[in-house]
From Swiss-Prot:
Residues 125-137, 221-258, 333-350 have a biased composition (Low complexity). GO terms for molecular function: zinc ion transmembrane transporter activity. It comes from Dictyostelium discoideum. GO terms for cellular component: membrane. This is Protein zntA. The lineage of its organism: Eukaryota, Amoebozoa, Evosea, Eumycetozoa, Dictyostelia. It holds the Pfam family Zip. The chain crosses the membrane at residues 35-55, 185-205, 355-375, 388-408, 422-442, 451-471, 486-506. Belongs to the ZIP transporter (TC 2.A.5) family. It is found in: Membrane. The gene is zntA. Residues 138-154 have a biased composition (Acidic residues). Residues 155-179, 317-332 have a biased composition (Basic and acidic residues).
Amino acid sequence: MSIFAYSILAGLAPLLSSSIPFFTLRNRNINASVFHILLCISAGLLFAVASLELIPESMNLALRSFEESTKTQTSLKSTTTKTTTTTTTIGNIKLQKSFISNSEDSLNEFHSLDNEINKPPIEGLNLNNLNQATNLDNNEEDNDNLDNDGENEIENDHDHDHQEDEGGDNDHDHESEEKKEFLKIPMYGIGFGFAILIIVESIFSSIDGGGGGGGHHSHSHGSLSSSSSNDVISDYISNNNSNNINNNDDDNNNNNNNNDDDDDSVELLERNVVNKDNSNNINNINNNNDDEDIIVINKSIENTPNIASPVMNKDNNNNDKDKNRNSNKSDIKNSGSINNGNNSGNNNNNNKSKLTITTFIALSIHSFVDGVVISSAFSSSPHVGARVALAIVIHKIPDGLVLSSLILSQKKFNSGIFSNPFFYFLLISCMTPLGSFISSFLFGGLSLSSGAFVLGFGAGTFIYITSTAILPEILSNQIVKKSTSLFSIFLGYLLFIFLDSQFHGAH
């Protein structure tokens, strides 16, 4: 029951850490830069969880698995290799020899020698004479071999040491190669986590109809609309140029009849004409009626009093053309930027929705893995399981902050059951007890090597989200400066280091 108690506690930790900031900040008019900074902090937290918790823990499990495998092989060798010593006496002669129990040739030699020794004595053979003859032969052989004993012992010791050195080097090389194979297990998990999320994101991209390509199309359509509007205005300006040139001749003929009062009235009329032109241009560009644009502007010019004609000279006409050209270009730029802004806003919403779904899947996998780890730790010992479970409870608080930051950055909260963010918070919380239940009752606990793979898998999902989803969104957004974004990411990384040090310092 303690396994499920700790699993439920580990599930409640992200539920509380995500619900409190979400329900506190969702109805407040907070600047968009605040949500952007929260997103940056969540990126730092995710990368810290992957690099400082999951990957080191998976490496530790892989090394422990290697040590257990080495101990098992050593114990098997020690149990299968036993030495047997036999002593047989024939009169005053003692025969002693050691045999290795796992060698069939040595056992056969032992049995044959034992049979020879235990044969009945030959009739008429005097054992005393045999003993004396044997002793004389042995003394002569001992005297002959005294000089060679030292040399043989030195050579044997040298050969034995050389064989031990070669055997030790071979064992060391084999051990290092085996350790490398065990350390590859977390790396396999990281790669598998990347592959799974790539498949998930490609599925959601195909469902959304290729959201990534929409951004490019929005820019191209915006440029096409701007170019067509530019053609309309350029035609209008060229027509006005021809009309103004014709009017310049009449204006030059009537320059001598001008006075100061007429100049003041001309300036007022000139402003009215420009204002009418600008208002008509904006309305007609938004409605995409190119022909009506020219007609309305020409009518506004024709309906002006005749007092403008005798006093408008060449300089005034040039000023009017410059003002009209600048106002028309600014109108087109504004309309193009509005269209592009709407399209980019739609693309950002699509990216944020895919980002949140991908993050939700990764956090769900991570919560499931936490339940599996708690179950595996308790299967080794209750003390180790309790410490691992408490560590997971503390480390899951940043997970809730990550999810709440991502959802708050969207600024869209629906009241439906399946569209409410609290529903997804609850699902993530339930994944930890579910992982403990499946690991304990269905699989009977995971081995150390399997745990290393699972932790590596969770680390791979977090690194994928941080590097391919959150960081591009942060760097492409211009709400705050890039230096502020990078500092916020670093702040999130330091926040996890602080929480981790406080927890380990307490223990």
